[in-house]
Amino acid sequence: MKKKSIKDKEQENNWEEKVVQVKRVTKVVKGGKKLSFRAILIVGNEKGEIGVGIGKASDVIGAVKKGVTDAKKHIINVPLTKSYSIPHPIEGISGAAKVILRPSAIGSGVIAGGSTRTVLELAGVKNILAKQLRSSNTLNNARAVLNALSQLRTFQNTAQNRDINIERLFNM
């Protein structure tokens, strides 16, 4: 079976891209200051696949393009429940940022702020409660959410890890 390239994956899924932040950054060099742009992008298909990427270039368009390719390289799968929530509460950490994610009732919507909200919406999560702690850094908060979502486990995963069937897992 042939390996799927990034272009094949791109055609299969309808990826939605959102630019979370574009910053003007400078680097001091011998001749003065060199100006460039840093773009933070989130790419998702609202079906449980999500990625966060960064792009740096001398112009904004180039930074966004690099950010999209970087985000598509770092895509993770998110297990969603039937109510488009997460299976269990979880915490994620990236740098100084800490994010707490909790499943919520049907119809409650995405209760989150900043880049956390964008990541969760593009992942396809529709009912969740999230809280950002310790840091307001956009990139670290987005990565903390990605860290938390990558740690999520379903009942099937837990049963396989323990080498028992799902019925026994519920009866414990």
UniProtKB/Swiss-Prot annotation:
It is found in: Plastid, Chloroplast. Residues 15-78 form the S5 DRBM domain. Coiled coil: none annotated. One of its GO terms (biological process) is translation. The keyword RNA-binding applies. Its main location: plastid. Keywords: Chloroplast, Plastid, Ribonucleoprotein, Ribosomal protein, RNA-binding, rRNA-binding. GO terms for molecular function: rRNA binding; structural constituent of ribosome. It comes from the Eukaryota. The keyword NADP does not apply. GO terms for cellular component: chloroplast; small ribosomal subunit. PROSITE patterns: RIBOSOMAL_S5, S5_DSRBD. Belongs to the universal ribosomal protein uS5 family. The N-terminal domain interacts with the head of the 30S subunit; the C-terminal domain interacts with the body and contacts protein S4. The interaction surface between S4 and S5 is involved in control of translational fidelity. Part of the 30S ribosomal subunit. Contacts protein S4. With S4 and S12 plays an important role in translational accuracy. This is Small ribosomal subunit protein uS5c. It comes from Gracilaria tenuistipitata var. liui (Red alga).
